[in-house]
Amino acid sequence: KKCIFTTKSDRNLDFLINAWRQIYTLNKDAELYINPPYNVSQDLINLKIKLRHKGSKNNLINDLKSSKIMLVPGHKGEVFCLAAEEARELCLPIVTMGYGSLYERVEHNKTGYIARNLNEFVNYTHKLLNDKDLYLKFRSHLLSLRNTRNFSHVANELINLISQNK
């Protein structure tokens, strides 16, 4: 059960590692892959936190395709989150806190979960890792959305968002 975090470590990786301590307690067969550079201590290795091997886009695509869930809390400074969009296109459910643009990238209870607190983040991750029917429901919805976003779609979303905030 591979989980992945493919964004920068300053995008609330500390929150994720704290959450992972609880997630791993509930899911001893789960692994969390994070982006380098990051100092993975023996304590984190014992929690099955591993560094991805960065490199070509093919490496990233293969890492995403071999993962079950993307865990990405988000960050207040994030205005788009390409990592979440990549996960969406590869039909990978996301568990997030919805910080920054993540609340726009995830449809709660359809393409992933937007947690309101640490407990929900842990519980949503646990559910997706262990409930095959739920995982397949999310994946099916993501498959139906695949290749539906293009430049004009994203531009219209931005215009609508700006209009709502006037």
Model-derived regions: residue spans:
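Short acidic/histidine- and often glycine-rich active-site loop of Leloir-type glycosyltransferases
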Residues: 99-109, 113-114
